[in-house]
């Protein structure tokens, strides 16, 4: 039997390649991670956890001196810079800016973010006396807005459901939660899954394409309600995976 014969089924049709193991994820330990909005609670917490896990991290802010002060506070080799420098020097850029400044920030960094793997973790929310509620951006979601504003970037969405309180608490060794990761290209999604898995206790789980990002972002409003009722810092676990 020739090698050509062995690559065919008994009917003569080409044999299917074996399915890829969904947990066979790339090594991302050598990639530089930038965090836009790295001086805010969520960005600062993510920067701390990733740096503590051994990732090279740069936190960005509109004011470089504020970013450097926050980086010094975090330790673990974290550096601080303005947003533009952070974007230029990073392989992966996490967007953790407030929703109100999301579009303007990304539009101003379009050139610096070209070719970069962008991870949007912004949750468009409103608040009133009844609590948190989801907003619906014109583009459909914060992640889709990012994709529209950054046509030359590889946009994904992840890290929406993490408690900033737990992320920043040095007494907590593991963050017991799954991270839902969305994106258009499997290779990009798997890099973000692997990045999430660098943080002890976390798993990155593929959760669909960017068109599904709205409900993932919106779920944070429900988690805020859970946290207020039960005095908790709730996360998510996906079962049977």
Say what each PLM segment does:
Residues 29-32, 115, 176:
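Phosphate-coordination loops involved in phosphoryl transfer and adenosine-cofactor binding
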């Amino acid at each position: 039997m020739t090698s050509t014969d062995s690559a065919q089924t008994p009917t003569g049709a080409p044999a299917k390649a074996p399915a890829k193991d969904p947990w066979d994820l790339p090594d991302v330990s050598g990639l530089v991670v930038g965090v836009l909005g790295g001086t805010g609670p969520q960005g600062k917490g993510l920067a701390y956890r990733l740096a503590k896990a051994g990732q090279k991290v740069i936190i960005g802010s509109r004011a470089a001196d504020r970013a450097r002060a926050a980086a010094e506070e975090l330790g673990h080799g974290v550096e601080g810079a303005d947003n533009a420098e952070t974007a230029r020097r990073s392989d992966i850029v996490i967007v953790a800016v407030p929703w109100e400044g999301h579009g303007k920030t990304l539009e101003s960094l379009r050139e610096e973010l070209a070719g970069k793997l962008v991870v949007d973790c912004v949750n468009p929310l409103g608040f009133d006396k009844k609590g948190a509620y989801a907003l619906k951006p014109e583009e459909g979601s914060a992640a889709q807005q990012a994709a529209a504003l950054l046509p030359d970037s590889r946009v994904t969405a992840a890290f929406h459901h993490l408690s900033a309180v737990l992320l920043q608490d040095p007494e907590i060794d593991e963050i017991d939660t799954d991270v839902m990761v969305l994106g258009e290209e499997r290779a990009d999604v798997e890099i973000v899954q692997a990045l999430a898995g660098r943080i002890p206790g976390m798993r990155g789980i593929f959760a669909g394409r960017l068109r599904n990002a709205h409900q993932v972002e919106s779920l944070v409003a429900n988690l805020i309600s859970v946290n207020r009722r039960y005095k908790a810092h709730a996360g998510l676990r996906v079962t049977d995976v």
